[in-house]
Amino acid sequence: MTKWNYGVFFLNFYHVGQQEPSLTMSNALETLRIIDEDTSIYDVVAFSEHHIDKSYNDETKLAPFVSLGKQIHILATSPETVVKAAKYGMPLLFKWDDSQQKRIELLNHYQAAAAKFNVDIAGVRHRLMLFVNVNDNPTQAKAELSIYLEDYLSYTQAETSIDEIINSNAAGNFDTCLHHVAEMAQGLNNKVDFLFCFESMKDQENKKSLMINFDKRVINYRKEHNLN
């Protein structure tokens, strides 16, 4: 894992209206090439969902954990889940399809539970999955992200509206997206690193430029805020 502790993720879902599977794979491979050759902050992570205990009772089913490289994070799905994570002093993985307000509430539950169990979480850093779509035309950026997600959200019967989900991710021009990402980090007490997904962007050259620029700006942001 790189010292900057950022990464990318891919949504493992395909629908006919989006694009051919071969193009989806080609775009994903291009993302990996950019990471390898042109940037320095991104980790490539593999998701493996397990459970925090070996017994599969109702409580542990609420607390799936996800391996990100060599690190283990608890998927922040409910107050019960994050209380369980706090008891073990394990970091959280915040979902891209939750509202920012829900993420903040879950973090508050986590911190309160850690205090209750007398667990030191001062050095714990969480992760937040975010979709990023940058376009000089913000309407186009949001439209591309909406098209990319709409069938997945319909299939999973998401409780949150697609407009709220888009507003809880990052779609717009570059400066707006970067500011929004920083705001979300601050809302979570600067205790989160990010997993970005750029795959909703149709323009591959624009995606490459974005990833390289994000690379530079995120490194500077972390240095300015002593997040090494």
Swiss-Prot record:
Binds 2 FMN per subunit. Each FMN has a myristate attached. This flavin-fatty acid linkage is probably the result of an enzyme-catalyzed reaction, most likely the bioluminescence reaction itself. GO terms for molecular function: alkanal monooxygenase (FMN-linked) activity. This is Non-fluorescent flavoprotein. The keyword Flavoprotein applies. CDD domains: Flavin_utilizing_monoxygenases. InterPro entries: Bacterial_luciferase_CS, Luciferase-like_dom, Luciferase-like_sf, Luciferase_bac/NFP. Its cofactor is FMN. Homodimer. Gene3D superfamilies: Luciferase-like domain. Keywords: Flavoprotein. It comes from Photobacterium leiognathi. It comes from the Bacteria. The gene is luxF. SUPFAM superfamilies: Bacterial luciferase-like (SSF51679). Belongs to the bacterial luciferase oxidoreductase family.
